[in-house]
């Protein structure tokens, strides 16, 4: 009995070695044969345009890519069948994969919602910054015009003071005009002080908004990186993993394709 088992094990080992040798030779020689069947002579391509050559290289790359994918799929399929004992995927494995996939999808959706909220907040803050900037620029223009008026009033006042120093009699209407100019000058100075204080407050508010915007940009970048990490965790396939994990990844991809077909 033990001898039969050992003989059977020896036969299975030889078969496995032969199949592995065939697979290795197929992997080594397959691309060469494919390249030999699809390669075009270099002398014939010289007379063609660069665009036509580029199209040929693209088609060749597509064929080679498909061939490599087909070879890898065949190899994984054969290794899964010829394992001793053969690898079987149970319903529990599928349920675990579905649970993991659903949890990852939920996390991805929540991250997407957070990113959308951050984007809306950034847009709102940008609009507020734009409106505040426009109002500050308008106030600056008004301040410039007020300063020009102030300079003209100061020049007129200086002229009146020079005229008064010549001991010429001041007419009542001129004296009234001087008082009016002085009161207007005081009002203008008060308005300038008010505008300066408002400009300082607006500058502080603008600096605070700029800081908030930089923080929001950092949070948006972090959320985008987390979203990309989750996507990569869902779609990443490790070529050097064991056969069982590769089959599980294959089932996961099939489930995603079915979900996409159902959503359409």
Swiss-Prot record:
Belongs to the KRE28 family. It comes from the Eukaryota. One of its GO terms (cellular component) is kinetochore. Component of the KNL1/SPC105 complex composed of at least spc7 and sos7. Part of the outer kinetochore KMN network that includes the KNL1, MIS12 and NDC80 complexes. Interacts (via C-terminus) with spc7 (via C-terminus); the interaction is direct. It holds the Pfam family Sos7. Acts as a component of the outer kinetochore KNL1 complex that facilitates microtubule-kinetochore interactions and the spindle assembly checkpoint. Kinetochores, consisting of a centromere-associated inner segment and a microtubule-contacting outer segment, play a crucial role in chromosome segregation by mediating the physical connection between centromeric DNA and spindle microtubules. This is Outer kinetochore KNL1 complex subunit sos7. Its main location: nucleus. One of its GO terms (biological process) is homologous chromosome orientation in meiotic metaphase I. The keyword Lipid metabolism does not apply. InterPro entries: Sos7, Sos7_CC. It comes from Schizosaccharomyces pombe (strain 972 / ATCC 24843) (Fission yeast).
């Amino acid at each position: 009995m033990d001898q039969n088992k050992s003989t059977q094990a020896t036969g299975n080992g030889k078969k496995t070695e032969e199949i592995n040798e065939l697979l290795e030779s197929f992997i080594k020689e397959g691309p060469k044969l494919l390249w030999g069947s699809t390669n075009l002579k270099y002398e014939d391509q010289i007379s063609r345009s660069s665009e036509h050559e580029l199209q040929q290289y693209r088609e060749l790359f597509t064929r080679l890519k498909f061939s490599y994918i087909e070879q890898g799929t065949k190899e994984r399929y054969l290794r899964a069948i010829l394992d001793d004992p053969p690898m079987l995927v149970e319903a529990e494995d599928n349920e675990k994969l579905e649970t993991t996939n659903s949890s990852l999808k939920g996390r991805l959706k929540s991250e997407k919602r957070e990113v959308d909220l951050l984007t809306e907040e950034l847009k709102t803050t940008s609009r507020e910054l734009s409106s505040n900037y426009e109002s500050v620029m308008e106030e600056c223009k008004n301040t410039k015009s007020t300063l020009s008026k102030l300079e003209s009033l100061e020049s007129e006042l200086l002229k009146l003071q020079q005229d008064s120093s010549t001991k010429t009699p001041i007419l009542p209407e001129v004296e009234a005009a001087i008082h009016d100019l002085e009161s207007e000058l005081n009002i203008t100075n008060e308005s300038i002080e008010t505008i300066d204080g408002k400009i300082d407050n607006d500058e502080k508010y603008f600096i605070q908004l700029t800081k908030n915007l930089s923080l929001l940009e950092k949070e948006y970048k972090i959320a985008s990186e987390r979203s990309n990490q989750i996507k990569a965790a869902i779609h990443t396939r490790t070529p050097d993993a064991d056969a069982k994990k590769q089959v599980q990844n294959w089932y996961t991809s099939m489930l995603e394709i079915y979900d996409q077909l159902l959503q359409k």
